[in-house]
């Protein structure tokens, strides 16, 4: 079987959580199924070191999507042509958008429906496109894959899609995240924060991630505790949020904030050496970033909304993302209570054992097979 996938969102050297998880998921699926051919399609050169096996062909082609017209060319002309050229049996649309101009069986990945809840950073033309076309994409798909029950329920309720059409593939923290020993932690802290303890956020720097409220919470923490602790924001700056860098430059505690784009290797080490991971996002379709932190054996503070509680269970402290004082209170609670911190780490180990990237890849592969309607073929 030939499986084509749109991987435009993956492969950057800059770590941003979801796309890194998706890249690794596709990588494992291809490696575990050497008898099938994979065609990974991207609109830009792949920056990440390619670890794909010989059964993977990476196709780099334009146009890069910068506006609605180029998006239409990509999905309605370029993608159908490539699917015909490579005689694809299944097409994986990895970002919730697909071509409506092909008969190729479709596995549609819907990570979230954030455009319905947090539309302000989205250009009006793109927002109009998503609101108008998403129902068509969902109806067209042979199988829909999400990474949480939360998103599945949203799809069913808001777009009247049958539950039977939707498969929930649980997320998993990447195996590259692991607990550091004390010497490694001290080495990382010395390198990045002058030996000081720090809270960390990893992921794309984007309005949806609620980092302004995180800065406000850190201000409250600094005022109340009079501590020398730092805040690390590790991730690439979204092009829609360039003014955030200026906010950090004028921030009262700017000398205690480290904002940096980083590779996944750096994110692993920075996360493992942190005192706690803070993820106060307004909306999330999956908890992969939280699971990365849990795998690193550090405690988690995250939002009570969307999919976070579904994923982290009792292994996290939960906050109202709209209330920076609530975020600050949880930071101070961990700062003061070492036994609570240790308890969350131990609970995290139990949660981490429930998620496995190999198992996630197997479930995803079964979803791909469901999208392929040809009768009488053994695709195991």
Predicted regions and their residues:
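Carbohydrate transferase catalytic cores enriched for Leloir-type hexosyltransferases
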Residues: 1-380
């Amino acid at each position: 079987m030939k499986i084509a996938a749109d991987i435009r969102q993956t492969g950057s050297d800059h770590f941003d959580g979801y796309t890194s998880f998706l890249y690794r998921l596709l990588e494992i699926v291809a490696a575990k199924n050497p008898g099938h051919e994979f065609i990974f399609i991207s609109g830009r050169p792949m920056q990440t070191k390619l670890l794909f096996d010989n059964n993977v062909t990476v196709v780099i082609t334009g146009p890069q999507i910068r506006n609605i017209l180029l998006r239409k060319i990509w999905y309605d002309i370029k993608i159908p042509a490539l699917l015909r050229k490579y005689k694809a049996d299944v097409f994986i649309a990895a970002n919730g958008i697909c071509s409506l101009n092909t008969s190729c069986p479709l596995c549609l990945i819907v990570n979230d429906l954030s455009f319905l809840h947090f539309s302000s950073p989205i250009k009006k033309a793109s927002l109009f496109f998503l609101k108008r076309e998403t129902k068509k994409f969902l109806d067209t798909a042979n199988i829909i894959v999400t990474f949480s029950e939360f998103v599945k329920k949203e799809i069913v309720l808001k777009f009247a899609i049958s539950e039977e059409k939707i498969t929930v593939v649980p997320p998993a923290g990447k195996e590259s995240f692991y607990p550091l020993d004390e010497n490694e932690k001290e080495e990382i802290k010395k390198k990045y924060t002058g030996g000081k303890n720090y809270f960390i956020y990893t992921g794309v720097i984007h309005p949806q991630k609620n980092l302004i409220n995180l800065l406000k919470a850190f201000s409250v923490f600094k005022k109340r505790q009079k501590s020398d602790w730092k805040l690390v924001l590790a991730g690439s700056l979204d092009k829609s949020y360039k003014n955030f860098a200026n906010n950090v430059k004028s921030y009262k505690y700017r000398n205690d904030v480290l904002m940096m784009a980083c590779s996944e290797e750096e994110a692993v080490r920075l996360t493992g050496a942190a005192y706690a991971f803070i993820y106060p996002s307004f909306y999330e379709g999956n908890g992969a970033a939280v699971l990365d932190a849990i795998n690193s054996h550090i405690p988690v503070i995250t939002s009570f909304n969307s999919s976070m509680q579904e994923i982290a269970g009792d292994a996290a402290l939960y906050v109202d993302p709209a209330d920076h004082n609530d975020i600050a209170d949880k930071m101070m609670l961990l700062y003061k209570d070492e036994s609570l911190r240790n308890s969350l780490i131990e609970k995290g180990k139990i949660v981490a054992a429930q998620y496995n990237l190999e198992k996630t890849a197997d479930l995803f592969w079964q979803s791909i097979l469901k999208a392929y309607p040809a009768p009488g073929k053994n695709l195991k």
